[in-house]
Amino acid sequence: MRLSVFIIPLVESRQASGIINKQSTSLLIRFSLYLEASISTKSFFSKSQRISQTQSPICLSANYYQPDNLDMEATQKHMIQEGSSMFYHQPSSVKQMDLSVQTFDSYCTLESSSGTKSHPCLNNKNNSSSTTSFSSNESPISQANNNNLSRFNNHSPEENNNSPLSGSSATNTNETELSLMLKDLETAMMEPDVDNSYNNQGGFGQQHGVVSSAMYRSMEMISRGDLKGVLYECAKAVENYDLEMTDWLISQLQQMVSVSGEPVQRLGAYMLEGLVARLASSGSSIYKALRCKDPTGPELLTYMHILYEACPYFKFGYESANGAIAEAVKNESFVHIIDFQISQGGQWVSLIRALGARPGGPPNVRITGIDDPRSSFARQGGLELVGQRLGKLAEMCGVPFEFHGAALCCTEVEIEKLGVRNGEALAVNFPLVLHHMPDESVTVENHRDRLLRLVKHLSPNVVTLVEQEANTNTAPFLPRFVETMNHYLAVFESIDVKLARDHKERINVEQHCLAREVVNLIACEGVEREERHEPLGKWRSRFHMAGFKPYPLSSYVNATIKGLLESYSEKYTLEERDGALYLGWKNQPLITSCAWR
């Protein structure tokens, strides 16, 4: 129940008529917000008593957008990604949703749902994580126990910025605050209207005047259901460390978002998680915790494959890169491919088959597969498994084949580790990986540009780049928040077309494959923020500075991608610009592919 929506306009009209003074106006507004919080909090605790605790499931990371179809069996088409988890309250229906949990201590964050493991927080060495359980209808429900938010929950005299909505969940404390607030209200209504007295009042009135323009704006957005606008206002409040405004907006947003609702509601649930984590300074700990868990069952390995089939983004990237490589080595007898994110090796299935059918006979193919050693659990083994699978496929296609696995981070790559040989045509592949490399804005090493210069020194025949078309690298928090919202909302909308909202795996796909990126973009800063996308224009500048020249994609590649999109929604758009391809949703570019030499 949003009492403030009704009380605030009524109170201000009474003030304008001279019926009550400004001091009383401020206290009435504050009282309505507090009462609204108390009602919602009691509702939450009555529900939370029924929550059981089990071990949390695992999420898959967006670093592994490849199908495991090397054995060409349906049971081996699973996409495998790095482990992570994402939880959010899921109501039985959007209209009946009641997620109005006012206190930070009661709010479910990713960190609070980290299973039975304990992950230390940056700002709290004694942090402990609670467990999470699933209800019988597979709705993710968790009971938070987040010590990282304790500074918002402790009502000590030294803390003057405590919000009435962010206090401790203890009943006695709430009753004491409510009694004091009622006494202040009674006193204020008996006093004359003195501006100085009003100006000396604390709480919402002191920080915002009677009702700030931001609050009016937010209330109007809430009344018309403008979820994007309310999310933006909450992000502004978080950036300004405006705890009272943030608390109130979080309580409203909890009633507006849903992991089973419209695309904007589903994305909003994860963006809200990111905002709460950022405010608690726990984003980096959450992100690390999401990456270090082990798989709990083979069914979790299917999520990326579902996304791979539902949307053409990754097929677009792989097929366009393979087309450029096939064109560049069409007359070569010895081909060496360096893949800077080999994952399952699924990208190379179609290329090996194409090379096996090449007129004049196949070339000798050697692949150097680089992958972060942390991802070995996703394959349930080391890179030798990738080599074995690709080797079997190459043998079936009559392609002489050799594989070398390099289990190291891209920031650790040196020339001597790549095994380059004279007389080989060299192709280098960067599939959705360079945006994870820190640049000059993060570290003096500037691994992003260093890696490009290193590759240029190898004199490759072709270098392929596939990246998300977004500007989140050096953008300040608020512009980055808006960019994240616009980019991922288009992705969520495209998923909505293919996977019904009652699809039993859709929530898992979005939580495990996309939410991790969203939380990292919003909650983390500095070296902890690994998602650092750049638009193609900036990548062009980097490649030019490293000494590369464009290698325009052929018309054959363009035709191949157009044929691919025929089996998907007509809302997908394909644009060729300056030798590069842009795949978008409703004319909003989401992913780009280009080649260099």
From Swiss-Prot:
Region of interest called SAW, as start-end residue ranges on this chain: 523-597
Family annotation (InterPro entries): TF_GRAS (IPR005202)
Residue segments, region Leucine repeat II (LRII): 385-417
Localisation per UniProt entry: Nucleus
Gene Ontology annotations of biological process type: regulation of DNA-templated transcription
Compositionally biased spans, kind Low complexity: 123-169
Region (PFYRE): 426-520
Leucine repeat I (LRI): region residues: 225-285
GO cellular component labels: nucleus
Region (VHIID) location: 304-369
Keywords: Nucleus, Transcription, Transcription regulation
Domain GRAS: 218-597
Top-level taxon of the source organism: Eukaryota
Region (Disordered): 111-172
One Pfam family hit: GRAS
Motif (VHIID): 335-339
PROSITE patterns assigned: GRAS
Tissue localization of expression: Expressed in seedlings, roots, shoots, leaves, flowers and siliques.
A GO MF term: DNA-binding transcription factor activity
Protein family membership: Belongs to the GRAS family.
Function summary: Probable transcription factor involved in plant development.
PANTHER family given in the database record: OSJNBA0084A10.13 PROTEIN-RELATED
Name recorded for this polypeptide: Scarecrow-like protein 5
Source organism of this protein record: Arabidopsis thaliana (Mouse-ear cress)
